[in-house]
């Protein structure tokens, strides 16, 4: 059982409160301030999109120098970079998808962006690329040939693996939003794709709790499945009020028992003992004032750490006795009492 964890969050988790229905309600924080804030909150790593690190309008010949300045900022703040993720969903060139676009020029641009991301990663000191295929799907099924689309996804993964023999790809799957019908909507789908790549040992998953809930699945079971495969290389912990849009609520604030089970499966299976990081992908409520718009991060970290303590302290012999006697009512109360501090 591992009870010692390192923590990370994305720079996007310190945001302005803008949403699809309203503008920003807080000022934007400069990158350097975001980094120092994360460190002050007790985080060890930062997560970045490619254009968080190096904006897309930076000329190709200046990308490395720009990335070096960001690396110096991270070093000064005392943060390592956990991963970099290519942002393949905002550019108008990817309106019909990036990796699975019908237009071969869009697919080529998506691969160029992945290569640029890897070049940035190498400067920032990480070999971990998180791939969220946000627009890889359809609004109507007839618009794309799904068999060809899966082939494009495999070609894309193989091209990334060939570009840098040290890179590791972490697929982060989600069933919907922004696309109505997503290709590879679940962990299992991506792991099946990973097995078909040219180098399966370098392809794993990052599991986001809210995405599992949107699938109608339990995050703990999804994590367990990836752990069984030896493929759980990252997590995004948060919470979710049911099957709706991706809310990124503070971890454990909706369903504490579900959160406990996610923590417990990580603790019991030594997640973190081999360099894996606990990522918190949570948003401040739009109502939060600017100077309090970081409590969602500290609160989520505290909930995780408290649940680790519950997992470590719970009587495993009593737990096992309830299982062996098939007394699941007794087991349920053991868990509930532990969560209530009774």
Residue locations for each model-derived region?
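Short, structurally constrained coil/turn elements
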Residues: 1-3, 75, 163-165, 199, ...
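Active-site acidic/histidine proton-transfer and metal-coordination neighborhood
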Residues: 75-86, 90-204, 291, 330-337
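N-terminal pre-domain/capping segments
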Residues: 1-122, 200, 298-342
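Hydrophobic faces of well-ordered beta-strands that scaffold small-molecule active sites
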Residues: 5-14, 46-48, 79-86, 129-131, ...
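N-terminal cationic-hydrophobic initiation segments that often serve targeting/anchoring roles
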Residues: 39, 71, 161-162, 194-198, ...
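Gly/Pro-rich active-site loop or hairpin
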Residues: 15-35, 144-150, 180-191, 211-277, ...
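Glycine-enriched alpha-helix->loop->beta-strand junction motifs that scaffold or abut catalytic
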Residues: 42, 127, 199-202, 227-233
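Active-site-proximal loop/turn and secondary-structure-junction residues that shape catalytic pockets
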Residues: 13-15, 50-52, 85-90, 133-137, ...
């Amino acid at each position: 059982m591992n009870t010692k964890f390192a923590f990370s969050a994305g720079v996007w988790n310190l945001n302005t409160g803008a949403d699809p229905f309203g503008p920003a309600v807080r000022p934007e924080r400069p990158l350097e301030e975001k980094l120092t804030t994360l460190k002050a909150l007790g985080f060890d790593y930062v997560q970045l999109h490619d254009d968080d690190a190096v904006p897309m309008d930076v000329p190709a010949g200046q990308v490395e120098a720009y990335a070096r300045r960001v690396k110096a900022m991270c070093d000064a703040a005392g943060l390592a970079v956990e991963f970099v993720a290519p942002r393949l969903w905002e550019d108008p060139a990817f309106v019909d998808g990036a990796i699975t676009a019908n237009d071969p020029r869009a697919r080529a641009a998506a691969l160029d962006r992945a290569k640029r991301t890897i070049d940035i990663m190498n400067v920032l000191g990480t070999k971990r690329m998180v791939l969220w295929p946000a627009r890889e799907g359809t609004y109507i099924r007839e618009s794309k040939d799904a068999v060809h689309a899966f082939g494009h996804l495999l070609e894309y993964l193989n091209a990334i693996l060939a570009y840098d023999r040290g890179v590791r790809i972490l697929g982060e799957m989600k069933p919907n939003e922004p696309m109505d019908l997503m290709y590879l909507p679940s962990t299992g789908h991506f792991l099946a794709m990973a097995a078909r790549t040219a180098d399966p040992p370098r392809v794993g998953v990052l599991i986001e709790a809210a995405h599992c809930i949107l699938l109608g699945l339990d995050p703990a079971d999804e994590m367990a499945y990836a752990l069984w495969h030896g493929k759980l290389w990252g997590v995004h912990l948060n919470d979710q009020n049911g099957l709706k849009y991706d809310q990124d609520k503070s971890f454990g604030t909706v369903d504490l028992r579900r959160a406990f089970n996610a923590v417990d499966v990580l603790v019991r299976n030594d997640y973190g003992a081999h360099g894996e990081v606990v990522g918190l992908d949570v948003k401040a409520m739009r109502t939060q004032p600017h100077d309090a718009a970081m409590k969602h991060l500290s609160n989520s970290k505290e909930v995780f750490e408290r649940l680790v303590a519950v997992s470590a302290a719970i009587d495993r012999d009593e737990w096992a006795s309830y299982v062996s006697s098939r007394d699941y009512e007794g087991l349920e109360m053991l868990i509930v009492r532990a969560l209530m501090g009774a």
